[in-house]
């Protein structure tokens, strides 16, 4: 697999290098030189496979030149060892595709665990790596648990202090060992800026073997393609004809993966890019002007991102496929509407959480009579227990994954958004 840097098309690397580097020169994202396409016969065959076998087939379309299908299958099996997503019907035209049945109760488990397996597979020289990543909530836990206890790998996770839930914090800030966590006195965008500055420091990058586990890493992105095929396989042929998928968007990696699935030949009619009040992309799609505003805090904190990293990949995919960006549906939802939507879903017998509620709201409001809609459930409602209970005036129980960490002490350090302070921490052995 060859990939090129979106900021310098002359910089081309193979899959192994892209996984290990994370970003190219000038913080450029890597993007596939060739975009594979399935024939209708291939698609029909692949939809009948089980999740692990199908995922292996999909991923091998991209990386078979570097990793054999047999080896890949073993790593996919280890990465996706949790129960496959469940499809919950809300009504006859709308279902929730739940992606939160992994070890850290969020869709990020798919990408993080596959990336960990790829580094294991490709690190033949037993090199040491420092994984530096920023999280607005769920990425931190998924990455921490995926890499926990791995030899020669140190993980450092930045997150905005006071802007993720305590339950989210407890999932990854209580592990210790090779997992280090730093709360930043600022926003998630401040955390991302620090990560990018670290990658810009060539000497630092080389001295500590710096890598990133955010959705900027191509291995995470490819893994997420797989569950869109799973979603498609679970619905009837009649409903497949006019399928619309609403995606809660933060860094836009999830939507990028869905669009790559469509690029492969999965006949999804359209996607809805769903944001909260941090609506840089909806405003851009509406006006044609890219104008990020200061990030505001919302109850859907994992989407509190004003400068989404993956947007350049979406623009590149639309350019390469000659698709029209006007075909991408979009919308933003305020906290007040999110709260009312959570109550609406609860009255229908479904307990959700703020991110999925935003996707449901926009899907419900934009879905046409002849269409069938899926909205993605990206995190377990219990991760937002305090918020959800307050809105619904009803208690929700904690799953064992959260109960097990509920009373453990937080092991985080705290710094201001100062790159020199972060650099000192990174250089500590």
Swiss-Prot record:
Task: Tell whether Disulfide bond is among the UniProt keywords.
Answer: no
Renumbered to this chain, the signal peptide range is none
Write one Pfam family the protein is assigned to: PALP
Q: Which reaction does it catalyse?
A: O-phospho-L-homoserine + H2O = L-threonine + phosphate
Q: Which GO terms describe its biological process?
A: threonine biosynthetic process
**Alphabetic keyword roster:** Amino-acid biosynthesis, Lyase, Pyridoxal phosphate, Threonine biosynthesis
The coenzyme or cofactor needed here is: pyridoxal 5'-phosphate
E.C. numbers: 4.2.3.1
Q: Name one GO molecular function term.
A: pyridoxal phosphate binding
The record's function comment reads: Catalyzes the gamma-elimination of phosphate from L-phosphohomoserine and the beta-addition of water to produce L-threonine.
Q: What is this protein called?
A: Threonine synthase
What gene is this protein translated from? thrC
């Amino acid at each position: 697999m060859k990939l090129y840097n979106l900021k310098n098309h002359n910089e081309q690397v193979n899959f192994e290098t892209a996984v290990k580097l994370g970003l190219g020169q000038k913080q450029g994202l890597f993007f596939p030189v060739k975009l594979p396409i399935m024939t209708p016969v291939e698609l029909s065959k692949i939809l009948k496979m089980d999740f692990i076998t199908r995922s292996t087939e999909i991923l091998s379309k991209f990386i078979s030149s570097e990793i054999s299908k047999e080896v890949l299958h073993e790593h996919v099996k280890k990465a996706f060892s949790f129960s496959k997503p469940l499809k919950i019907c809300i009504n006859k035209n709308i279902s929730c595709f739940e992606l939160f049945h992994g070890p850290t109760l969020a869709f990020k488990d798919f990408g993080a665990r596959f990336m960990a397996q790829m580094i294991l597979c490709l690190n033949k020289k037993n090199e040491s790596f420092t994984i530096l990543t920023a999280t607005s909530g769920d990425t931190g836990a998924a990455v921490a648990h995926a890499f926990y206890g791995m030899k020669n790998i140190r993980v450092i996770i930045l997150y905005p202090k006071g802007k993720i839930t305590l339950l989210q914090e407890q999932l990854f800030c209580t592990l210790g060992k090779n997992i280090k966590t730093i709360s930043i006195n600022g926003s998630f965008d401040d955390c991302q800026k620090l990560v990018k500055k670290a990658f810009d420091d060539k000497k630092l990058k080389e001295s500590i073997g710096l890598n990133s586990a955010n959705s900027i890493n191509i291995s995470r992105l490819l893994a997420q393609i797989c569950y869109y095929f799973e979603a498609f396989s679970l619905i009837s042929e009649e409903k497949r004809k006019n399928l619309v998928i609403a995606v809660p968007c933060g860094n836009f990696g999830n939507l990028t993966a869905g669009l790559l699935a469509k690029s492969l030949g999965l006949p999804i009619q359209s996607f809805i890019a769903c944001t909260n009040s941090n609506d840089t992309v909806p405003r851009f799609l509406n006006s044609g002007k890219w104008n990020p505003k200061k990030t505001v805090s919302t109850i859907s904190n994992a989407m509190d991102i004003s400068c989404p990293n993956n947007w350049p990949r979406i623009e590149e995919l639309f350019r390469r496929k000659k698709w029209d960006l006007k075909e991408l549906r979009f919308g933003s939802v305020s906290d007040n509407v999110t709260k009312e939507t959570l109550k609406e879903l609860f009255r229908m017998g479904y307990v959700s959480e703020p991110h999925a509620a935003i996707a449901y709201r926009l899907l419900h409001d934009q879905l046409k009579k002849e269409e069938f809609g899926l909205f993605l459930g990206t995190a377990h409602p219990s991760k937002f227990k305090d918020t959800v209970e307050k809105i619904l005036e009803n208690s929700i129980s904690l799953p064992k994954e959260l109960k097990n960490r509920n009373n453990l002490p937080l092991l985080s350090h705290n710094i201001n958004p100062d790159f020199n302070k972060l650099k000192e921490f990174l250089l500590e052995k």
